[in-house]
Amino acid sequence: MNGVSAVVLGVIEGVTEFLPVSSTAHLTIAEALMGMKTDAPAVTAFTAVIQMGAILAAIVYFRRDIRTVVTAWFRGLVRADERRSPDALLGWYVIAGTIPIGLAGYLGRNVIKHDLRSLWYVVAGLVLWSIAIVYAERTAAQRRDLRDMRLPDAVFIGVIQVLALVPGVSRSGATISAGLRQGFDRVAATRFSFLLAIPALLAAGIFELKDAVGTSGVSMASLVVGTGMAFLTAYASIAWLLRFVAHHSLTNFVWYRVTVAVFVVAALTTGLVHAV
């Protein structure tokens, strides 16, 4: 993993992590185009660790929201009158929504790292979840905000988030679509998607960090560069997406997703890239 590769992958991670286009799909495609073996330990560990840059960007961007929720959650542990406050409950909902992907990610880590790294899975995920995004947008009521959230909503969104372990689905695409299906408006669904991303991706990055540092082909310098680039570009991406969803439908991303899928199929069938 050289410096140029680290910069390129870091930028791709940051730009795409929170957009409903699948960062894993874009990273896998970029790795294949650069001649990397997409299921190699060095590659999978590197991409997992640089996610921490994107997550740090989310933490910085939503620092006031996070401080409010965490403070209310801890107060709710010791004060009965705080336990039912909207912010304390939101803390519990983030925890509940994180549990499904935490269990699935840990129990299925070998399948995720190897069996699901094929570009054909990327194509399937991009196309099939594009249909789900269109369906969610066209059938959603979009009348609720985060203060209307209940435990079944959080669990449902968390379960749908598990599908994002398949490259091409998109974690944000899955969770925002699920939020829309539960009747939340786009901004509320997107904000909860960001909050839900923080514990899940931070845990994945920390879990992979020790392996990445000790893996041949991954230097600490490349990890720092990739993570730094992911942070900078993710911060800008978050700010842009929140403004975008306030006035535009997620279906605007569908044509892009389908175009990427068509490109990957063409690249695979012509031998430009290999599936794994």
Curated annotation (Swiss-Prot):
EC number: 3.6.1.27
Catalytic activity: di-trans,octa-cis-undecaprenyl diphosphate + H2O = di-trans,octa-cis-undecaprenyl phosphate + phosphate + H(+)
First-listed, main subcellular location of the protein, grouped into a coarse class: membrane
InterPro entries: UppP
Transmembrane portions of the chain: 42-62, 88-108, 116-136, 149-169, 187-207, 222-242, 253-273
GO cellular component, one term: plasma membrane
Any GO molecular function: undecaprenyl-diphosphatase activity
EC category: hydrolase
Domain of life: Bacteria
Membrane topology: Multi-pass membrane protein
Keywords of this entry: Antibiotic resistance, Cell membrane, Cell shape, Cell wall biogenesis/degradation, Hydrolase, Membrane, Peptidoglycan synthesis, Transmembrane, Transmembrane helix
GO annotation (BP), single: regulation of cell shape
Pfam family, one: BacA
Localisation: Cell membrane
Family listed: Belongs to the UppP family.
Additional notes on this entry: Bacitracin is thought to be involved in the inhibition of peptidoglycan synthesis by sequestering undecaprenyl diphosphate, thereby reducing the pool of lipid carrier available.
Role noted for this protein: Catalyzes the dephosphorylation of undecaprenyl diphosphate (UPP). Confers resistance to bacitracin.
Protein's recorded name: Undecaprenyl-diphosphatase
Protein's organism: Acidothermus cellulolyticus (strain ATCC 43068 / DSM 8971 / 11B)
Gene: uppP
